[in-house]
């Protein structure tokens, strides 16, 4: 395990997270018999938590990791009746690699075709806006103006918007940082023209750094889902997908977003 990855044992009790566990105890039905063997075959649920997306997870000054993804992992472990281990990583690409390599049982990912090899996805549980940030003096005023020759866009390597822009851009050039949290600082330091990222992260960066602004609107909608190693099979993927649908329908996902003060994300509609 690399220095950027840490593991935390999470005790499942109402004393640990009263609001989460109260919802878990009342809103979402138990999973079918055999679900624990399919989703947590080692007898513990290893959930990979990516800190690269602040809408889903954060670490506080004391080192405690919390967020919507942690709440969902806690709820799933409670429904399975197994202990929870959080495998914490700093970037989306690390999370993908961790689950593909079966070093975690589940993870939280933006759905993208390039990630489907090796990972089985649920339907999305939240929809997140991807946005652009520029310097105040930039001539850019609209998202449609970004994809032009000579425009350099800073992105987090392996992030959902990196994968999306790698497919969609016709003329602009991508520049990459190891993590999404470093995008705006590297954008400023290296003279890029645009920073791309999750709207909430860019809004937080704009609030603390002078001389930058967000372009209005969004350039993409990120579908955030749960996933597991594809080798677990279709039945395990269906169990995880069913859990996600229950969590959305019960109001659990909406309550978690509200509890963590998340803006720029909405609960995804029910899967058809």
Residue ranges and their predicted role:
Residues 2-16, 26:
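N-terminal secretory signal peptides and thylakoid transit peptides that target proteins
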Residues 27-32, 160-177, 214, 245-272:
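Ligand-binding clefts/hinges and TM-proximal coupling segments of bilobed small-molecule sensing domains
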Residues 30-110, 247-250, 259:
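Extracytoplasmic small-molecule ligand-binding "clamshell" domains
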Residues 46-54, 63-79, 111, 131-185, ...:
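Bilobed "Venus flytrap"/periplasmic-binding protein-like clamshell domains
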Residues 51, 127-137, 199, 203-245, ...:
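Periplasmic-binding protein-like
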Residues 67-79, 138, 144-150, 158-159, ...:
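Extended ligand-binding regions for polar small-molecule ligands
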Residues 74, 78, 83-147, 213-219:
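Acidic, polar ligand-binding/catalytic clefts
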Residues 93, 110-118, 164-167, 188-220:
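A ligand-binding cleft/hinge motif common to bilobed small-molecule-binding domains
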């Amino acid at each position: 395990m690399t220095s950027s990855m840490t593991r935390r044992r999470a005790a499942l009790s109402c004393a640990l997270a009263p609001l989460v566990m109260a919802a878990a105890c009342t809103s979402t039905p138990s999973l079918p018999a055999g679900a624990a063997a399919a989703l947590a075959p080692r007898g513990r649920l290893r959930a990979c938590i990516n800190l690269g997306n602040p809408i889903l997870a954060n670490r506080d000054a004391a080192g405690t990791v919390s967020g919507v993804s942690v709440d969902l992992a806690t709820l799933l472990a409670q429904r399975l009746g197994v202990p929870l281990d959080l495998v914490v990583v700093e970037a989306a690409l690390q999370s993908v690699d961790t689950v593909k390599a079966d070093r975690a049982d589940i993870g939280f990912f933006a759905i993208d075709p390039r990630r489907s090899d090796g990972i089985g996805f649920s339907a999305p549980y939240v929809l997140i806006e991807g946005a652009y940030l520029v310097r105040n003096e930039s001539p850019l005023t609209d998202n449609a103006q970004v994809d032009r020759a000579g425009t350099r866009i800073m992105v987090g390597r392996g992030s959902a918007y990196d994968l999306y822009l790698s497919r969609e851009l016709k003329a602009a050039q991508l520049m990459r940082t190891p993590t999404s949290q470093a995008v705006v600082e590297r954008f400023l330091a290296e003279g890029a023209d645009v920073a791309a990222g999750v709207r909430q992260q860019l809004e937080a960066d704009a609030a603390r750094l002078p001389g930058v602004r967000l372009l209005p609107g969004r350039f993409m909608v990120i579908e955030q889902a749960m996933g597991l190693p594809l080798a677990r099979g279709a039945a395990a993927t269906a169990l995880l997908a069913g859990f996600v649908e229950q969590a959305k329908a019960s109001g659990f996902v909406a309550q978690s977003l509200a509890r963590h003060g998340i803006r720029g994300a909405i609960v995804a509609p029910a899967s058809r």
